[in-house]
Swiss-Prot record:
Function (record text): One of the primary rRNA binding proteins, it binds specifically to the 5'-end of 16S ribosomal RNA.
Gene: rpsQ
Keyword set includes rRNA-binding: yes
GO CC terms of this entry: cytosolic small ribosomal subunit
Protein name stated in the entry: Small ribosomal subunit protein uS17
GO molecular function terms listed in the Swiss-Prot or TrEMBL record: rRNA binding; structural constituent of ribosome
Family: Belongs to the universal ribosomal protein uS17 family.
């Protein structure tokens, strides 16, 4: 089974080797027929502490690294 890859924005880099990435998804509400935005925060592993707040990144699913962390930052999305 392929590992999921999500795109988001780094919103916190205070922890050592960890960043918090906000991932936003949009979908059409079935009853209201309106586009709804929903966001979720993921803790991701950043081995070299190279990503800062505001960076666009891609995260990939991985084995559990800690209690809350099972994603790895794979690349920086340069706009």
């Amino acid at each position: 089974m392929p590992k999921r890859v999500l795109q988001g924005v780094v919103i916190s880099d205070k922890s050592d080797k960890t960043v918090v990435v906000k991932v936003e998804r949009r979908y059409s509400h079935p009853l209201l027929k309106k586009t709804v935005r929903q966001s979720k925060n993921y803790k991701a592993h950043d081995e070299n502490n190279q990503f800062k707040i505001g960076d666009q990144v891609s995260i990939q699913e991985s084995r559990p690294i800690s209690k809350d962390k099972c994603w790895i930052v794979v690349k920086d999305n340069v706009a």
